[in-house]
């Protein structure tokens, strides 16, 4: 295994409330679990070789994320970035007469621009995630449930990942192994049934951690080869 002593790596977790870990103690959030696992695996002798920033903001869409991107990502110049948005983008408010908060076309464009900007500022590896299943089946003002719309926006995520050649972490597929009657244990109870529970964060962390481990190992090997 490569030694972390050869590289100083910054990772930014960029996203909405799912990345922020809303309503769950910070020690139980998937970003904290992943950070702890990476530190245990790659840091030696108690020295700090890695820097982690959670830049998840509750309630935000890709449009709002793009507006704060210079401050929250570009300024950090991370080697690795995780990118997760969509559950707010696909939502349809009554006050918008059924229109999504962010259209499918704009959602796609916003993801691509964030990827382009991250790369321009030196990000070597980008992990783009689909969004997990929820139990939000009530029909929204636009005529579809949040669950139906989530699936549409997840397809956009997959298409963007393929087109931009970033790493796809298919969280939806990772949760597909969970029986429908057990999904409620992965989510906060009614009336939420959208945000991840402690068990949900653990499952999410297990799905995304291998991608980040490969990113870190790739960077460390490149640093050692250049030394």
For the regions a language model picked out, list residue spans one by one.
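Serine-esterase "nucleophile elbow" of acetyl-processing enzymes
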Residues: 1-58, 63, 68-77, 183
